[in-house]
């Protein structure tokens, strides 16, 4: 989200990173709050997709995070009669998926006629929440490899020089030092904090071990019958909001009759598996409300895709 706050509380360059609350300790994620120019504040919430409780809603967790006193402070009036009243104004909203598994999860970055660079490939320094420099560097390395290929009269082949150059670059060294950061969180927030601190500040990223993931994120999900529903507070329309009003200010546009780009191979799976076993988690994990379970005329359920 993008907000405009009271100039008296604005500190250009101020950075806040948080971990833990409101999520459980076994759920990977965290939040950021950056003070930019013109009394603007950019804030966001990251939720790892390896969470176990299907009732969790990344969007609702973000809204709840803003109610923490240390965060709410920047949006409310803390003086006079109207003390505690929200005086800041929300200007924008957005959401995206982040490839944040680190260097150990990089895919094959080259294919005939093309290459993957930047955050889409996973070149993200997870511990520092930095990716722009990696996107620029990998773009440069891929461009140099493409230039050499064109100079040699080659076309539509595989740019093997690009991944080779990456492995010799300072970026590889930087990301390699960060390789265990996310994987430590499978042991919980406390152990992850201790071990990441040890690796990054004591060993300076020169650890002789590498943590490997043994199963994909979705495999950590538990059936709804084994989990407790999460009671999220209703939005107040001042500090916390619902999905519909948020999407409205996201500047997302499409043609009125544009065909949906999301399709189902088997329409029975969302109902017979996801709704029956996991309480319809897709109705919660999408921060734009794209997936919605509705009733048919015969009172049976179906997944409606609002795209």
Show where each model-derived region lies:
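Central beta-strand plus flanking loop segment that forms part of the substrate or channel wall
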Residues: 1-12
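Aromatic-residue-lined binding/catalytic grooves and analogous aromatic/hydrophobic interfacial grooves
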Residues: 17, 21-25, 35-36, 217-228
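Conserved FAD/dinucleotide-binding core of flavoprotein oxidoreductases
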Residues: 23-92, 159-163, 191, 202
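Short FAD-binding loop at a beta-strand-to-alpha-helix junction that anchors the flavin cofactor
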Residues: 37-39, 108-127, 284-292
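Glycine- and acidic
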Residues: 45-46, 120-130, 267-270, 293, ...
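Acidic, polar low-complexity linker/tail segments
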Residues: 93-108
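Active-site-proximal substrate-binding core of FAD-dependent oxidoreductases
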Residues: 122-128, 134, 140, 144-191, ...
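Ferredoxin-type iron-sulfur electron-transfer modules and their immediate structural context
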Residues: 169-304
């Amino acid at each position: 989200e993008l907000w405009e706050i009271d100039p008296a509380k604005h500190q250009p360059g101020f950075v806040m990173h948080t971990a833990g609350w409101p999520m459980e300790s076994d759920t990977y994620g965290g939040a950021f709050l950056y003070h930019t120019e013109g009394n603007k504040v950019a804030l966001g919430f990251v939720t790892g997709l390896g969470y176990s409780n299907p009732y969790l809603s990344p969007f609702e967790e973000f809204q709840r995070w803003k109610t923490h006193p240390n965060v709410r402070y920047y949006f409310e009036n803390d003086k006079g009669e109207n003390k505690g009243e929200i005086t800041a104004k929300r200007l924008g909203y957005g959401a995206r998926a982040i490839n944040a598994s680190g260097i150990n999860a990089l895919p094959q970055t080259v294919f005939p006629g093309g290459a993957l660079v930047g955050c889409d490939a996973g070149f993200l320094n997870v511990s520092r929440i930095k990716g722009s420099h990696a996107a620029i560097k990998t773009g440069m390395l891929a461009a140099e490899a493409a230039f050499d290929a064109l100079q040699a009269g080659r076309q539509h082949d595989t740019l093997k020089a690009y991944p080779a150059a990456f492995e010799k670059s300072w970026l590889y060294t930087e990301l390699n030092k960060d390789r265990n950061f996310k994987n430590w969180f499978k042991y919980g927030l406390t152990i992850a904090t201790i071990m990441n601190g040890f690796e990054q500040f004591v060993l300076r990223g020169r650890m002789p071990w590498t943590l490997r993931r043994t199963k994909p994120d979705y495999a950590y999900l538990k059936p709804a019958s084994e989990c407790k529903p999460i009671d999220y507070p209703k939005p107040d329309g001042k500090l916390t909001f619902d999905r519909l009003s948020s999407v409205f200010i996201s500047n997302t546009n499409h043609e009125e009759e544009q065909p949906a780009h999301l399709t189902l191979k088997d329409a029975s799976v969302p109902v017979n598996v996801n709704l029956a076993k996991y309480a319809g988690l897709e109705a919660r994990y999408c921060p734009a409300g794209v997936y919605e379970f509705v009733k048919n005329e015969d009172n049976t359920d179906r997944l409606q895709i609002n795209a």
